[in-house]
Amino acid sequence: MKKLVTFSILAVLAAGLVFAQNSSLQEPNPENVGADSAESALREVSVDKFEREGSWNVHMSADDGVITSRLFEGNPAMKEPLPDDEGKEGEDTQVLGVRVDFFRRGKNSFTIKSGRPLAIEGTTKTLSVWVCGRNQDHELYALVQDYFGRNFELYMGSLGFSGWKKLICVVPPSPDGEHGIVQSSAYYGDKPGLKIIGFRVDCNPMQARGTYYMYFDDLRAVTDLYDMENHDEDDMADNW
């Protein structure tokens, strides 16, 4: 009889513990509400459409080969226009072509950089660009600069495909506002947090030979504009 009573008591205690655990999972923790359910206003914005001749510069070591670039008429057929760009198709007709003539096979790389850093307002979540590849296993990186002017590179993907493909990379958030890619600070005024410097292509040593072609179009970002869109109209701007 004592064993039966003891077992019943243990069963009741276990059920209460499970109920308490389930309640703690379902009920919001006041200490985490601000962090877990912060408001956001994500928008996809155009950063550059590669429409201006001379706005991008290409470079590679003179020991490795010769690189040139120019604009061409063209567009990815699968590209969807942004809502703000509907009806403006005539303003988006160019792509940036890059040609590399390798001297020899080796561990080569080349860069495609904007003539000026491209600032993105808000807190950038992802970057995307349309790339026309030639099925060679080179690798593309985005070169960015954070709020404090520190340089970072973000892996966008392999170029081992033919035709147009949209490559996307995630911008990792800073864990503490000091390390990693910092995009805002309460201590240093109000300014765009992320700047795009350009791209770097790391070449596959076995395929870095002959002539290589690639094309770029429609550089975009998904950014959180909540703080900007909910800024009081009569508030002052800390940008002087």
Spans of model-derived segments:
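Positively charged n-region of N-terminal signal peptides that target proteins for export
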Residues: 1-4, 21
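Small/flexible residues
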Residues: 4-5, 202
